[in-house]
């Protein structure tokens, strides 16, 4: 029986049953397996993929929608093509399918330099940049005098309200999964009001800090320091490059620059919400 051409292989929705196959695809491309993250994204978002007739996946990606009925925004991430099928138009075909399926919904994604030309070809525009930093956090110098504590169930309403103001869209289905997904979820308080929150979730040998929502840089610093004090793993996070003060601060405390990604959008000229209080995404794959 002849092997079907890549162009004829159907695109289907992925489910949590595809978690291991998605992790295999990550590994195939030299990425960490990140099974914990794949599980989170496949349950909170919509996965799309192409099955390989020889087993596994040819390609995959995940779309995370924000907004209860008509999404105000959708983030595309984890766009991967198996090495043996690279540079044959598979990623382009999958992306075109996703863009078409999302209709009029504004889209965003974080692009590596490798992926950016494809996204530009599809009509995405660069609207910002994020810097990935990683390392063991070493406390030093005057620390911000901002009170932080572990979040409780009673904080959820206030966290959701703050998050929607800052993110610019309803992320209830993401935020409510954080207590199970993350190893730490902490809030910053002033006068009984929550002025920021952050999570640290396990990813291979690191703890990823995200989301990081804070009233200002000093609150963001306090949240990072409080998360770092409660883990023996290196931290990793992706910080909007406009937050120069925070980037300088984390680098002075042991984190090093790993890479820059372009923040791109489709159907909107800039992301909704308040970037000045949005320091890091939950993951670059979900915004």
Question: Which residues make up each language-model segment?
Answer:
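Conserved active-site tyrosine of GNAT-family acetyltransferases
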Residues: 119-120, 124, 250
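Surface-exposed beta-loop interaction hotspot
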Residues: 127-163
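Basic, Lys/Arg-rich alpha-helical nucleic-acid-recognition elements, primarily the DNA-binding modules
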Residues: 7, 13-14, 25-46, 56, ...
């Amino acid at each position: 029986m002849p092997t079907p051409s890549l162009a004829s292989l159907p695109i289907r929705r992925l489910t949590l049953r595809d978690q291991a196959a998605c992790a295999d695809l990550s590994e195939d491309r030299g990425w960490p397996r990140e099974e914990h993250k794949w599980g989170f994204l496949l349950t909170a978002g919509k996965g799309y993929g192409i099955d390989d007739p020889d087993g596994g996946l040819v390609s995959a990606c995940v779309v995370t929608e924000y907004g209860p009925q008509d999404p105000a925004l959708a983030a595309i991430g984890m766009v991967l093509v198996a090495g043996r099928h690279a540079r044959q138009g598979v990623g382009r075909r999958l992306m075109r399918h996703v863009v078409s399926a999302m209709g009029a919904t504004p889209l965003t994604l974080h692009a590596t330099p490798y992926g950016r030309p494809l996204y530009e070809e599809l009509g995405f525009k660069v609207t910002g940049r994020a810097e990935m930093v990683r390392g063991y956090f070493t406390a030093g110098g005057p620390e911000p005098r901002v009170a932080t504590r572990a979040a409780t169930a009673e904080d959820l309403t206030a966290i959701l309200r703050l998050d929607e103001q800052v993110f610019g869209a309803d992320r209830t289905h993401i935020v409510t999964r954080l207590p199970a997904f993350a190893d730490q979820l902490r809030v910053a308080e002033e006068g009984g009001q929550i002025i920021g929150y952050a999570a640290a979730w396990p990813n291979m040998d690191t703890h990823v800090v995200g989301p990081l929502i804070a009233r200002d840089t000093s609150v963001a610093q306090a949240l990072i320091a409080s998360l770092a004090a409660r883990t023996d793993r290196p931290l990793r996070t992706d910080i909007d490059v406009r937050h120069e003060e925070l980037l300088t601060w984390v680098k002075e405390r042991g984190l090093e620059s790993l890479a820059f990604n372009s923040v791109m959008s489709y159907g909107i000229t800039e992301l909704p919400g308040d970037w000045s209080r949005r320091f890091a995404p939950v993951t670059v794959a979900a915004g």
